[in-house]
């Protein structure tokens, strides 16, 4: 196997794809090429780097594009290959042999976008992003009173420093495809996990806020009402925001 010398930026992009599974060219530009004076230059630099990684068989892009063929090269969706994982000296956790379903891809890219928003807030000096765990690193396990092992699977875990305070979040990315009952049941898993005290022992006595990120205001209202009506005194553990208002909501907490 040929030895490939990676630049720091190339290694960072491979590491991102190893963690998030999928990212668009546009997301990669936002994270790693904001030092360009013009958007066109940023995309050209990103495309050159990604093409180099593709030619070395370290990454691939899906056949499907976000926004269709007319959306241009910025709509490519990239993922790391087995060879790319080996270049990072990481075990291969995912096998991207097949094109993902549209729903799975949309959901995964929304998680990546939440990470992009937080990194941009950090670059703007609004927050310090201490930690961001994608799946499965963000997963938690706990046992019921009967000894049954339960898996809690957030979409991500984020730990931020905002001014003098440290905040942590379990992120749930909702695409308005699940029933409200399933949303409520997922919330009840968080309550059960909260009652074990496991996370509080890891987080200096604080349980992370469970942040539901939804596609539009109608879904936000529906989930908010469901949480308030079914979770009794536990509803302050949860917050619902749209993906569009996620950045301003997080950034605005620095002024509280």
Across the structure, where does each feature detected by a protein language model lie?
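Nuclease-adjacent, charged terminal/linker segments that flank catalytic cores
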Residues: 1-99
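Hydrophobic, Leu/Ile/Phe/Ala-enriched alpha-helical segments that form helix-helix packing faces
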Residues: 32, 50-54, 114-122, 190-198, ...
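Amphipathic alpha-helical dimerization/coiled-coil segments
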Residues: 86-132
């Amino acid at each position: 196997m040929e030895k490939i010398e990676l630049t720091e930026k190339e290694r960072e992009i491979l590491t991102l794809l190893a963690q998030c599974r999928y990212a668009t060219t546009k997301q990669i530009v936002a994270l790693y090429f904001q030092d360009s004076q013009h958007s066109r230059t940023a995309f050209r630099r990103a495309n050159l780097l990604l093409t180099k990684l593709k030619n070395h068989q370290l990454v691939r892009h899906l056949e499907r594009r976000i926004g269709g063929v007319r959306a241009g090269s910025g709509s490519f969706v990239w993922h790391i290959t087995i060879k790319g994982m080996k270049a990072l000296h990481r075990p291969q956790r995912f096998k991207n042999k097949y094109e993902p379903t549209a729903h799975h891809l949309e959901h995964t890219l929304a998680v990546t976008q939440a990470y992009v928003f937080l990194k941009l807030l950090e670059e703007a000096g609004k927050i310090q992003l201490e930690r961001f765990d994608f799946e499965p690193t963000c997963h938690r396990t706990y046992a019921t009173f009967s000894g049954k092992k339960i898996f809690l699977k957030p979409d991500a875990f984020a730990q931020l420093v905002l001014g003098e305070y440290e905040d942590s979040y379990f992120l749930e990315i909702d695409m308005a495809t699940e029933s409200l009952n399933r949303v409520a049941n997922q919330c009840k898993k968080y309550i059960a996990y909260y009652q074990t005290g496991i996370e509080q022992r890891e987080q200096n006595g604080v349980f992370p806020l469970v942040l539901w990120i939804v596609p539009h205001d109608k879904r936000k209202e529906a989930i908010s009402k469901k949480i308030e009506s079914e979770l009794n005194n536990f509803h302050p553990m949860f917050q619902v925001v749209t993906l569009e208002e996620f950045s301003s909501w997080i950034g605005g907490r620095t002024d509280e």
